[in-house]
Amino acid sequence: MFKATARYIRVQPRKARLAAGLMRNLSVMEAQKQLSFSQLKAGRCLKKVLDSAVANAELNENVKREQLNVIEVRVDAGPVYKRTKSKSRGGRSPILKRTSHLTVIVGERER
C-alpha cells in the first residue's frame, strides 16, 4: 500500500468528501478520469494527491499504474481560520475559513 497526503488545503471538508466519493473503490485509471472531469476545486486537489500516491508506488516498488486500486480516501478537517465581516451599526459577523487534510492510499489489485 502506498500513501500520499496533502495537509492544510483551503477546501471545506464537507465539499471535499463529495469529491472523495467519486473515486472510492475504483481503479487508479478510472479515478483519474472521474477527477479530471470534475468541476470541484476539491477534485483537482484530490487528483494531485492521487497522482502523488501513484508516483510513490511506481518509484519505490516498480508497480505499474494499471495494477493499482484506490483502497482508501480520507478527508479530515484541518484548522479553521476565523475572520470577521463588518456589519451595520458597528457589529460584525464571523467568517470561518475551513481547511482539510486529504489522504489517499492505493494498492495492488487482488487477483
Swiss-Prot record:
GO cellular component terms attached to this protein's record: cytosolic large ribosomal subunit
Annotated Pfam families: Ribosomal_L22 (PF00237)
Purpose: This protein binds specifically to 23S rRNA; its binding is stimulated by other ribosomal proteins, e.g. L4, L17, and L20. It is important during the early stages of 50S assembly. It makes multiple contacts with different domains of the 23S rRNA in the assembled 50S subunit and ribosome.
InterPro entries, per the entry: Ribosomal_uL22, Ribosomal_uL22_bac/chlpt-type, Ribosomal_uL22_bac/org-type, Ribosomal_uL22_sf
Protein name per UniProt: Large ribosomal subunit protein uL22
Subunit field text: Part of the 50S ribosomal subunit.
Gene name linked to the record: rplV
UniProtKB keywords: Ribonucleoprotein, Ribosomal protein, RNA-binding, rRNA-binding
Family classification: Belongs to the universal ribosomal protein uL22 family.
Highest taxon above the source species: Bacteria
Keyword Transmembrane assigned: no
Organism: Chlamydia felis (strain Fe/C-56)
Keyword Cytoplasm among record annotations: no
GO biological process: translation
A molecular function (GO) term: rRNA binding
